[in-house]
């Protein structure tokens, strides 16, 4: 997994792994959740990948749009 930069210093996300049709997110609690095109939708997954690369906004996005859409 790639380290999440956490530019805002308040994120609950610590790392992520992006694949062609999914993103796996590790939270500071140690829990890992996978979000796929199938369950969360391609638009959400692609936006999450962009936020992960940016290092900002991923935790907020998850809480707002895809909190329970993990595999």
Feature map (PLM): residue ranges:
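A charge-rich, low-complexity, intrinsically flexible signal that marks solvent-exposed coils, linkers
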Residues: 1-71
